[in-house]
């Protein structure tokens, strides 16, 4: 596997697999990035459907009990305890975050951009796990790099107003710009 195909070094949860690949991987290898075939191409899990969502940069969570042929509308987090089901997220600049109980009984996938982070997409998803989140593991997939994501003072101040501990995540660039 090259740098265009990534997975966590350690398992996220029992029987939970995470895969992340870039659009370039498909083009370089002359593979059609058709969503319905992704698991079949890259794993032995050809009969497992992937549930996608139409992401809106918010914090809405949808609990999935069974696969739908259509993406779940207006949501940024999918949660399930259903076996033989994969949850999928499409990202560019935003963070793909996978969560799972260590025993694999509950799992979630999040689309976490700055709007979702400010509105609590991670926190709202963690509340869905039974018996709290002390035995929940996370994997954050690839996203835009710090050096390529300049933001203004307004966004910096929004994060500081939510949590002043956010300051360590920003680098002052000057002229009301932050990385």
Regions found by a protein language model. Give the residues of each.
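Active-site microenvironment for binding and transforming phosphate-containing groups
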Residues: 1-179
């Amino acid at each position: 596997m090259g740098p265009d195909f990534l997975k966590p070094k350690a398992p996220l949860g029992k029987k939970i697999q995470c895969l992340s690949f870039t659009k370039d991987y498909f083009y370089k290898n002359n593979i059609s990035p058709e969503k319905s075939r992704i698991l079949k191409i890259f794993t032995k899990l050809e009969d497992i459907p992937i549930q996608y969502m139409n992401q809106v940069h918010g914090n809405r969570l949808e609990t999935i009990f069974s696969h739908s042929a259509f993406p779940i509308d207006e949501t940024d987090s999918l949660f399930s305890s259903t076996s033989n089901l994969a949850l999928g997220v499409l990202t560019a600049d935003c963070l793909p975050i996978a969560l799972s109980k260590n025993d694999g009984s509950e799992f979630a996938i999040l689309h976490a951009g700055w709007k979702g982070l400010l509105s609590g997409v991670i926190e709202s998803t963690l509340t869905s796990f039974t018996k709290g989140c002390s035995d929940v593991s996370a994997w954050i997939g690839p996203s835009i790099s710090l050096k390529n994501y300049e933001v203004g003072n307004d966004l910096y101040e929004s994060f500081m107003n939510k949590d002043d501990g956010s300051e360590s995540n920003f680098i002052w660039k000057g002229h009301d710009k932050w990385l």
